[in-house]
Amino acid sequence: MGLYSERVVPRIVHVACGSKNVEPLRRRVCEHLAGNVVEIGFGSGLNVPFYPASVTRVAAVEPSDVGWKLADKRLRAATVPVERSGRDGQSLPFADNSFDAGLSSWTLCTIPDVATALRELRRVLKPGGSLHFVEHGL
């Protein structure tokens, strides 16, 4: 990742996607999550406060170290274990059929090969698993 992508973009996204007017959308996309969840594009952890009690674990995929630093306060307050588990939604480091649900919020439009990322999500979701997403660019 270049300097702009690594240092500037995560902060812009944190501010733009962290506004109060998107909280109802975050709440809605997260409300039916349950079990073991993979979140691609974890960013600065803005979904963490909206994980329902039915979520047992989150494997968070995020390329930006800055995003992780911005997530620190939310991660410390999380009621669900969240682990950084990879950097690339196009190549998920998990076995097939590992997750009950996938989560992506305003991320798919930023992935260079979204079809590959969606295939990867399908691969790691258990049969009957669900993908929960909100997007502005698809």
Regions found by a protein language model. Give the residues of each.
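A short acidic, Gly/Pro-enriched loop at the edge of an enzyme's catalytic core
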Residues: 87-102
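Class I SAM-dependent methyltransferase SAM/SAH-binding core
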Residues: 38-91
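A short glycine-rich, Lys/Arg-flanked "PGG" loop and its adjoining helix->strand segment in the class I
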Residues: 115-130
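A short SAM/SAH-binding and catalytic strip from SAM-dependent methyltransferases
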Residues: 100-113
